[in-house]
Amino acid sequence: MAKQRPATLSVYLYIPNIVGYMRVLLNCIAFSVCFSNKTLFSLLYFFSFCCDAVDGWCARKFNQVSTFGAVLDMVTDRVSTACLLVILSQIYRPSLVFLSLLALDIASHWLQMYSTFLSGKTSHKDVKDSTSWLFRLYYGNRMFMGYCCVSCEVLYIILLLIATNQTENLMNVVVKSLMQISPLSLLLALSIFGWSIKQIINVIQMKTAADVCVLYDIEKQHKKP
């Protein structure tokens, strides 16, 4: 008699993955009103971002960690940030600043994921063998990583909210906002600091991942007869 396969819950219906679908839906609604209602957009976008921590907690709590869930999580994060950066590039000048940030974000994370598969690691956050102390600190300390990630999103949301014209000079708006002594200026300063660290991490991540790819090519050539 053939051995019956155990009944298992479809990976697509894992609780953390359902949370991921909700994040996608929230982002779709948010970006549909990003120009007509910036306050609603900010609330929906930030709530979706906060749910990023919820799906990770659910995955560990219910033992529903999956490769699909990890990919869905990263793709949702990258696409959400990319869309917001594109919007900011239409509001602020020079727009190349935000397009460059978009390129760095996508390139660094894509290379990191690809190098993870090449090295046989199970997670792109496994950087114990990295020579960069800042890189190890970032992925080894959840609080520090959370601060940097939240800072990026908060900074981008603030920039969207304080823009009053269709085209703004980025430096003028940032300097003017920082000069005003207020809770907003303090939040902006804290966000800029965390954002700066995150961009440094992205550069280190891209270089480290590129080194892994190059090393893989060298080792493959040496194995050839």
Swiss-Prot record:
The keyword Oxidoreductase does not apply. Mg(2+) 1 binds at D52, D55, D73. One of its GO terms (biological process) is phospholipid biosynthetic process. It is an enzyme of class 2 (transferase). The chain crosses the membrane at residues 6-26, 29-49, 84-104, 143-163, 184-204. Gene3D superfamilies: 1.20.120.1760. It is found in: Membrane. It holds the Pfam family CDP-OH_P_transf. Keywords: Lipid biosynthesis, Lipid metabolism, Magnesium, Manganese, Membrane, Metal-binding, Phospholipid biosynthesis, Phospholipid metabolism, Transferase, Transmembrane, Transmembrane helix. One of its GO terms (molecular function) is CDP-diacylglycerol-inositol 3-phosphatidyltransferase activity. A CDP-1,2-diacyl-sn-glycerol binds at G56, R60, S66. Its cofactor is Mg(2+); Mn(2+). Its EC number is 2.7.8.11. Mg(2+) 2 binds at D52, D73, D77. It comes from the Eukaryota. The active site is at D77. One of its GO terms (cellular component) is endoplasmic reticulum. It is a multi-pass membrane protein. The keyword Lipid metabolism applies. It catalyses: a CDP-1,2-diacyl-sn-glycerol + myo-inositol = a 1,2-diacyl-sn-glycero-3-phospho-(1D-myo-inositol) + CMP + H(+). Belongs to the CDP-alcohol phosphatidyltransferase class-I family. Catalyzes the biosynthesis of phosphatidylinositol (PtdIns) as well as PtdIns:inositol exchange reaction. May thus act to reduce an excessive cellular PtdIns content. The exchange activity is due to the reverse reaction of PtdIns synthase and is dependent on CMP, which is tightly bound to the enzyme. This is Probable CDP-diacylglycerol--inositol 3-phosphatidyltransferase 2. It comes from Arabidopsis thaliana (Mouse-ear cress).
